[in-house]
Amino acid sequence: MKNTLTALLTALAVSTTALAQTTTDTTRPLLIVTSFLPIQSHTLAIAGQNAEVVQLLGKDAGPHDFQLSPSDVKKLAEADLFIINGAGIEDWLDDLVKKSSNKDLVIVDSSKGVDLVESPEEVAIAGGHGHHHHQGDGGNPHIWLDPVIAQKQAANIVAALQKAEPANAAAYAENGAAYAAELEALDAEYRATLAPLPNKNLVSFHDAFPYLSARYGLNYVGAIAEFPEKDPTPRQLASLVDKIRELQVGVLFAETGYAPGLLEKIAKETGAKVSSLDTLEVGQGGAKAYLERMRKNLSSLQRAFGRDE
């Protein structure tokens, strides 16, 4: 993966003449709007000082519960690019584009080329069925929580910025290569830290971690709620408690930004501990935000799985 990404980004740096030309206003920096935190962080790292990068979602909003406002539409009025995670999580995208007066806006889907997974039958144990995010896409959209997939998303962003502004193509490729190396280092840290740990049963607040679990050998038992803002019914809750007891799950992961009351109630009934994982859906930050918050998640996993269940 490392050699492939390095070769790809190096090739992008020297092949600017092959890029399609676009008509951006050269009197101002490229103006980029991103959907939410992971995409904002990737784009800031790649753009550097060569573009203005603005996040659409405010610091307290997440993509699941985002409510479109006139000020959000206004943010896109002058933008050259709108970079999204894709995979269906921005299900308000069509409405946003429809209301925007910016007919020259280029939408960049950073999930291009990523294979989506269906949540397995046992994952949405609160509902007793597979959790289908945004059924038009037919897959789980939380791809950014896998650092290897994040490398693919970053490469897609590099290519989009080079196409939009060929004059800075080499700078975008150089920044992209440096960022790819940081993502590769993050992946290596996850592998080295998690591989030797026992008891890697993961029950999360909502169904955000199938990609991370598959990448690093975690047993993704299930999710508490179908969406972060939707609690299970009493019948679903009883089924969930039975499942946790049956599998002897020792740790339940609350979600940063949401009250852990429901998980604490389940933990009291089952004897499990409560820890916390960050989906990175809520908040704002700089070019290092993705790396920093993913490392905090790694520390949480290390502490939780290091316990004897």
Predicted regions and their residues:
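Gram-negative bacterial Sec-dependent N-terminal signal peptides
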Residues: 1-20
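Extracytoplasmic metal-acquisition and chelation regions
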Residues: 20-309
